[in-house]
Amino acid sequence: MPRSVNAVASRARRKRVIKLAKGYWGRRKNAWTIAKNAVERALQYAYRDRKAKKREFRRLWIQRINAAAKMNGLSYSQFMGKLAASGIELNRKVLADLAMNNPEAFKEILKKVA
């Protein structure tokens, strides 16, 4: 009996990986083993960095809020504490956007919490 190999599934799997490797440099885009390794590593980086992106943006928003608050005589922690105590429920993303693009509105919020 001849050896049974599922060539259709194997070819589909290889095509999928080679398609994901499109745009890579050198043999990474067309040599099966090298492309497989490159795509696997790229997917690991993508997974890791989707998580890191959330942390990085939070850090950026905090830095922007801190800079705007310090220009008005408050530290970040003092500002956030007073914001929570006053019952204003704005998240860091919105506060950072206001601090950057609409400083007058941010100053109004500072006046309300102080």
UniProtKB/Swiss-Prot annotation:
Keywords: Ribonucleoprotein, Ribosomal protein, RNA-binding, rRNA-binding
Pfam family of the protein (one): Ribosomal_L20
One example of a Gene Ontology biological process annotation: ribosomal large subunit assembly
A GO cellular-component term linked to this record: ribonucleoprotein complex
Gene3D superfamilies attached to this UniProt entry: 6.10.160.10, Ribosomal protein L20
GO MF, one example: structural constituent of ribosome
Domain of life: Bacteria
Similarity-based family: Belongs to the bacterial ribosomal protein bL20 family.
Role according to the record: Binds directly to 23S ribosomal RNA and is necessary for the in vitro assembly process of the 50S ribosomal subunit. It is not involved in the protein synthesizing functions of that subunit.
Identification of the protein by name: Large ribosomal subunit protein bL20
